[in-house]
Amino acid sequence: MKVLQCWDDGVVSDIRLIEILKKYNATATFNLCIGKNGEDREVVGQFEEVDIVSLKRSELYDLYKDFDVANHSLTHPFLSSLSYEEVHHEVAQNKAQLETVFHREIKGFCYPFGSALLLKSVEPFPSPVIYSFMVIRTVV
């Protein structure tokens, strides 16, 4: 088993995080939901009364180009609430769009909400959606 340092969702706080990672020559994987990154930055949630703001899609390449990028689904849904076809759409479309933005193969997948255990099956992906690694559980 391999332990990865992963950060999710493509948010503005990643700008400072990446400055720190680069300063210490650290690696990380960023799990992105490109459907959440539009033409403008927007508030996508709150954590402890602090706004969580998504990055603009046009910011993604320059920010994450020196790091691993993984698929985190298109819109970050509870995959267990979707049909097989909807899960496939969420995963395949996000992978394709990420590969277009980053000009490279996306080899990893991280389940939204941090756990494959939310799914009825841990293998929801028909070919050709194949990954070198999958994050199936996160620790906060």
Model-flagged regions — what are they?
Residues 8, 21, 30, 72, ...:
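Conserved, mostly hydrophobic/aromatic
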Residues 21, 39-43, 82:
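Short, charged, surface-exposed secondary-structure boundary motifs
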Residues 2-4, 27-29, 66-70, 106-108, ...:
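Structural preference for beta-strand elements that scaffold enzyme active sites
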Residues 13-16, 76-140:
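Catalytic domains of cell-wall/extracellular-matrix polysaccharide-remodeling enzymes
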Residues 18-25, 49-71, 98-100, 129-130:
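Acidic (Asp/Glu)-rich catalytic clusters
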Residues 1-10, 44-50, 76-83, 112-114:
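The substrate-binding groove and active-site-proximal loops of carbohydrate-active enzymes
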Residues 15-36:
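A short alpha/beta connector and helix-capping loop motif
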Residues 39-51, 116-125:
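Short, flexible/disordered intra-domain loops and linkers
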